[in-house]
Amino acid sequence: MNITVLCIGKMKEPYWREASKEYEKRLSKYCNLIITELKEGPSPLKEGEDILKRLREDDFVIALDMKGQPLTSEGLARRIENLGIEGKSKVVLIIGGSDGLSQDVLGRANLQISFSTLTFPHQMIRIFLLEQLYRSFKIIKGETYHK
């Protein structure tokens, strides 16, 4: 499976970069992962234009949004597993900037998910996402992973 994580903004702090690299390394056993950082724009609309330019028609797009569908770890694992079964090998997960995602991006998404109704920095959400992707693949493969 090819997974792209599109993120608005860069990870500046070394501790976030270290955590990201660790999960990227762990995920390399299960998928081809690409993380693309896009420049923060003056508005979600401009950021949305940049995001939409990077999407292909055959991408299965998952937007992270506070108003999205809440999933358990098992629920996310099932979604990812089903995408593979359905032959959808290109998955793009989108993390917006501090003002969220544009309506155009949310409209393009095949699925909108929420990790919480709380607000978190996008760097932290990226680590949460990578960890949950790793956990999902461990669940799919029936491998143990600490809880």
Locations of regions flagged by a protein language model:
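Rossmann-fold NAD(P)-binding glycine/threonine-rich loop
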Residues: 96
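S-adenosyl-L-methionine/SAH cofactor-binding core of RNA-modifying enzymes
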Residues: 31-91
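Short, glycine/polar-rich helix-capping loops at beta-to-alpha or helix-loop-helix junctions
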Residues: 100-104
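Conserved strand-to-helix beginnings and helix N-cap segments that scaffold or border functional pockets
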Residues: 16-20, 48, 73-77, 106, ...
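Hydrophobic/aromatic beta-strand patches that form the interior of the parallel beta-sheet core
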Residues: 6, 36, 62, 111-113
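N-terminal beta1-alpha1 ligand-phosphate binding loop
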Residues: 1-23, 27
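Structured adenosyl-cofactor binding patch, chiefly the S-adenosyl-L-methionine
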Residues: 105-147
